[in-house]
């Protein structure tokens, strides 16, 4: 897949970048470039992998010059750099705009100018029917990606995207928070017991990006079908695994910008989506601004579709949630008495 090629990962010191390195550094890939702002994380990654194929570039996706410096000679790009913490983006929405929207414009423009073969942009379920600044900025990121892709027919570059849900045990997510509270002897804090979230492992997220990389055409967005669970079921399954079933739970209400459930495909997208077994492909709307010719061609299929959300997908019970938790290195480390580290 990547034989003798150069891959650039923006925001590459996070969990996604680490997983890609683990999977591909020992293949025939020529080079993997990590582009990010945090020199400490880059140094940690350099020491962890200690591989001459791994190159590091300090920079910010907001700065086109630093992006271009890292982009020279690159064959493929995985664009993972983002501000993703919902409460932080609520209080600093313009920072989300600068990184998630303008930063994406910089990455895509640099890739096109550099004649990169394929770019995959990573998005989130919060981009669908967004109610918070992070989701709005990611929705706009997708729009930027699709708009750019319209002009790439006949060029050497293909730009597509992915959209995924909650990556379990990621930094800032609820599983590491629950564990911290347990270890401190505090009650678990649940925002709303009925709140549901899609549940994906890190390996699922990497598989989704690779599927998009191999199958995507310009403007496509890919979604992986995923199960969901209520926060109450997740908490119960975790307490059961750790033999803390009598531990107290406090219901505290939702945080800034939170939804009761998340949506991976809107009703309108589901009407046009292509079912590919484990995945959905959302094709771009390729109509131009000459809407007059579409006036008499209505789309009745939209009224017959429904969105794909964490309330209407496969729902995990406590047994199913327990089985999924056991797939996580974070949980295996806990059960083995090792220090568990949340993935970035």
Q: Which residue stretches match the model-derived regions?
A:
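Conserved Rossmann-fold cofactor-binding substructure of NAD(P)-dependent oxidoreductases
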Residues: 55-76
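Hydrophobic/aromatic anchor residues within beta-strands of the central parallel beta-sheet
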Residues: 56, 96, 119, 159-162
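Strand-loop microenvironment adjacent to phosphate/nucleotide-handling motifs in alpha/beta enzyme folds
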Residues: 113, 143, 147-344
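Rossmann-fold scaffold of SDR-type NAD(P)-dependent oxidoreductases
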Residues: 10, 71-80, 121
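Conserved residues in the N-terminal Rossmann fold of short-chain dehydrogenase/reductase
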Residues: 36, 58, 98, 192, ...
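Conserved Rossmann-fold NAD(P)-dependent oxidoreductase catalytic core, especially the SDR/UDP-sugar
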Residues: 79, 83-139, 143, 147
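Conserved glycine-rich Rossmann-like NAD(P)H-binding loop of the short-chain dehydrogenase/reductase
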Residues: 28-41
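N-terminal Rossmann NAD(P)H-binding glycine-rich loop of SDR-like oxidoreductase domains
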Residues: 5-27
């Amino acid at each position: 897949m990547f034989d003798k090629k150069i891959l650039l990962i923006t925001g590459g010191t996070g969990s996604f970048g680490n997983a890609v390195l683990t999977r591909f550094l020992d293949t025939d890939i020529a080079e993997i470039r990590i582009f990010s702002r945090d020199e400490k994380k880059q140094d940690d990654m350099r020491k962890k992998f200690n591989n001459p194929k791994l190159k590091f570039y300090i920079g910010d996706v907001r700065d086109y010059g630093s992006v271009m410096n890292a982009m020279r000679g690159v064959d493929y790009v995985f664009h993972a750099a983002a501000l993703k913490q919902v409460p932080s983006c609520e209080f600093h929405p313009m920072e989300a705009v600068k990184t998630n929207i303008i930063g994406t414009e910089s990455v895509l423009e640099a890739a096109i100018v550099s004649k990169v073969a394929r770019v995959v942009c990573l998005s989130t379920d919060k981009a669908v029917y967004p109610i918070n600044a992070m989701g709005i900025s990611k929705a706009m990121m997708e729009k930027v990606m699709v708009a750019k892709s319209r002009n790439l027919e006949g060029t050497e570059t293909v730009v597509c995207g992915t959209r995924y849900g909650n990556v379990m045990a990621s930094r800032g997510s609820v599983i590491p928070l629950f564990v911290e509270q347990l270890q401190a002897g505090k009650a678990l804090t649940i925002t709303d017991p009925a709140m549901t979230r899609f549940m994906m492992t890190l390996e699922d997220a990497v598989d989704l990006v690779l599927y998009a990389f191999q199958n995507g055409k310009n403007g496509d967005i890919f979604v992986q079908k995923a199960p969901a669970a209520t926060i109450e079921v997740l908490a119960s399954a975790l307490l059961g695994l750790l033999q803390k079933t009598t531990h107290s739970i406090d219901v505290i209400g939702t945080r800034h910008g939170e939804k009761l459930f998340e949506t991976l495909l809107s009703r309108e997208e589901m009407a046009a989506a292509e079912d590919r077994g484990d995945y959905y492909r959302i094709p771009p709307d390729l109509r131009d601004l000459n809407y007059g010719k579409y006036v008499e061609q209505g789309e009745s299929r939209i009224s017959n579709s429904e969105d794909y959300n964490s309330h209407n997908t496969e729902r995990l019970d406590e047994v199913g949630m327990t089985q999924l938790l056991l797939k996580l290195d974070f949980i295996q480390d806990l059960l083995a008495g090792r220090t568990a580290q949340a993935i970035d």
